[in-house]
From Swiss-Prot:
GO terms classed as biological process: secondary metabolic process
GO cellular component: membrane
Pathway: Secondary metabolite biosynthesis
Family: Belongs to the cytochrome P450 family.
Swiss-Prot/TrEMBL keywords: Glycoprotein, Heme, Iron, Membrane, Metal-binding, Monooxygenase, Oxidoreductase, Transmembrane, Transmembrane helix
Protein name: Cytochrome P450 monooxygenase 71
Membrane topology recorded in Swiss-Prot or TrEMBL: Single-pass membrane protein
GO molecular function: heme binding; iron ion binding; monooxygenase activity; oxidoreductase activity, acting on paired donors, with incorporation or reduction of molecular oxygen
Residue intervals passing through the bilayer: 7-24
Length: 498
């Protein structure tokens, strides 16, 4: 009996020693934590963060310049305030990596596809030819919006009746149509099976990410292997996209040196980028899927937030409608016209300020040990981010920060300083899209598409919430933010401009 007791005490002593060693050698122990930080009990902090990330990030932001929060298997360091956001942006790429941070947080090799994760052919295409050619491509986006809304909105709305619409689902379908008009063109952008594949894939990434991040790192390859959505999407999308790829490549080969009739569109640019980097053309299918994830998931959430605000604050509809009507009459449905809609731009930027897609941004993984200006030491391997929502609701940067003021940014703009406050721009105080050279490259396409959709809705529909219903609170799971599942009432109206 005494021998057994000795063994038990010895085992407890060993465990206590290991516990102390792990705690004392934690390279981030010097950074204040929100919640329990000791080994094992830190899992309680991870559980709290899953359920209450918004309040935890706010608490840390107001207490510390730099703090940490717990995920299941790691600590994430968070910097607070505009100055620290700017400092994080300026750390050179030799010392930190955006891509590795995104890989860790989104688990790209499991949630999307390993090939395009390693060779992101879509990124230079989005940064380069897509953004440069937005003006030329914009009429196709507008045309698809004009076709998609009448087809996908309930028939009762067309008869002048108020009808409840599941906004996020409907907007996701319309975003997918408009985006794929650019990604793959007609007629595939209207193919129901193809659209079902890309929409389901876009929303499965968030689902997969949540499942994988809930597992300890050692089990993630196993969990990732059994998640079916990415593999299924690559297979199903390939059925539709591969024939287009083969057709384009064959046409290029037949033309030889004379490429004057070569297609000049997103799919062609992806094919050229794959060939330039000597990748198998199968990666083009993955590039199309990644582009759809970025376009559909984020954009459908963003326009849903904007519509919820439009329905919740109907007093702002008329000034928006008057602005849109006047500009469309003068400039037509052009990219130039969209750029002149300052009130609409402000409305949507303000919506994004309070309802982004994440409570964190400007994510980086430390490649070489660094020390921040406040003296905080970050060792290699640290994941560090900026507190986006807390920055956006900081009274040092925004008057009445908790209040939705749709024309906040419109009032800040002047003719000589018009660009700095527009929806697409980032700053140290506005980091929804990230900040600096690693800010979301697709935001220029997305913002023009979303503003065109909102302009169409404001001209062609009245919207409101159901009687007695106020603007629902956003849903936070970890630091990810989604609009609540709710319906908005739509009624078609006769637009004064076409």
């Amino acid at each position: 009996m005494e021998d057994k007791a000795q063994y038990v005490f010895a085992l407890l002593g060993i465990l206590a020693t290991l516990y102390f060693v792990r705690w004392s050698t934690d390279p981030l122990r010097h950074i204040p934590a929100i919640g329990p930080s000791a080994p094992i009990v830190s899992y309680l902090s991870a559980y709290r963060y899953c359920r209450n990330a918004q309040s935890i990030l706010q608490e840390g932001y107001h207490k510390y310049k730099v703090f940490r929060v717990s995920l299941v298997d790691r600590w994430v360091v968070v910097v607070s305030g505009a100055d620290m956001n700017e400092e994080l942006r300026k750390v050179p790429d030799t010392h930190v990596s955006f891509q590795e941070a995104a890989d860790d947080l989104v688990q790209l090799k499991y949630t999307i596809a390993p090939d395009v994760n390693e060779h992101p052919i879509h990124t230079p295409v989005i940064r380069g030819p897509l953004t440069r050619n937005l003006g030329a491509l914009f009429p196709d986006v507008v045309d698809e919006i004009n076709v998609a809304f009448p087809e996908l909105m309930p028939a009762a709305a067309k008869r002048g009746e108020w009808v409840a619409v599941s906004v996020r689902d409907t907007m996701g379908r319309i975003v997918s149509r408009a985006s794929n008009r650019i990604f793959v063109g007609l007629p595939l952008c209207r193919n129901p099976d193809y659209l079902k594949t890309v929409v389901e894939f876009a929303f499965s990434v968030a689902k997969s990410r949540t499942i994988i991040n809930a597992a300890p790192a050692v089990f993630r390859p196993i969990v990732g292997h059994f998640l079916p959505w990415a593999k299924r999407a690559v297979r199903n999308a390939g059925v539709h996209v591969k024939p287009l790829i083969r057709q384009r490549v064959s046409k290029m080969q037949d033309a030889g040196d004379d490429q004057t009739d070569k297609s000049c569109d997103y799919l062609m640019w992806l094919i050229e980028e794959a060939q330039k980097t000597k990748q198998n053309l199968d990666i083009v299918v993955q590039g199309i899927l990644v582009s759809n994830f970025a376009a559909i998931h984020t954009s459908s959430n963003s326009i849903t937030h904007s519509l919820l605000n439009l329905a919740a604050y109907p007093q702002h509809v008329q000034p928006l409608r008057e602005e849109i009507e006047g500009i469309i009459k003068e400039y037509g449905w052009t990219k130039e016209a969209i750029g002149k809609m300052w009130k609409l731009d402000s409305f949507m930027r303000e919506s994004q300020r309070l309802s982004g897609i994440s409570g964190i941004s400007v994510m980086r993984k430390v490649l070489q040990d660094i020390t921040l200006s406040d003296g905080t030491y970050l060792p290699k391997g640290t994941l560090v981010v900026a507190a986006a929502f807390a920055t956006h609701t900081d009274e040092r940067y925004y008057e009445n920060p908790e209040v939705f003021e749709p024309f906040r940014f419109y009032d800040m703009r002047t003719e000589n300083d018009a660009l700095r406050k527009q929806y697409v721009n980032t700053s140290r105080e506005f980091i929804t899209f990230g900040h600096g050279k690693h800010a979301c490259p697709g935001r220029f396409f997305a913002v023009n598409e979303l503003k065109a959709m909102m302009a169409y809705i404001i001209l062609h529909y009245d919207v409101k919430l159901e009687e007695g219903v106020s603007r629902p609170e956003n849903v936070w799971i970890w630091h990810n933010i989604s609009p609540a599942s709710t319906k908005v009432l739509f009624r078609e109206r006769q637009s004064k401009v076409q």
